[in-house]
Amino acid sequence: YIGGNVAEKIKIANERTLVMCLIETAEGIENVEKIAAVPGVDVLWLGHFDLTNFLGIPAQFDHPKYVAAIRKMVAAASKHGKILACMTADEKWSRDYWEKGFRLFSVGIDSMLLQGALKQGIGVLQSLDESGKKNK
């Protein structure tokens, strides 16, 4: 934070702002072409778990409805020069979405990361004996 021309700072901030639109509903997929066409939108972010839920096919990532939705999203991003993004759980997942045209990834799914951290923490607590010292 330093002094300077406020108007110039706002201009620079606006140029550096990244706008990501989360696509996670059937309505989002229906409108993905219009969303991708909006000037200033940089990224289309896939909410894959929520999308399958809203499509009535929870966690069925090979279901024809989901596959068609992804194709529609990829086509819209390609047509309008937008970046595709999503969360990935592992290398296979990352490769699959890379091959589809996704280029921005959040590595690790929040619920899985939290589960891993909790499991590790509980393991430490379970290893303590009654005196509070760690068992060997």
Residue ranges and their predicted role:
Residues 1-136:
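Expand to "…catalyze enediolate/carbanion chemistry for C-C bond making/breaking, isomerization
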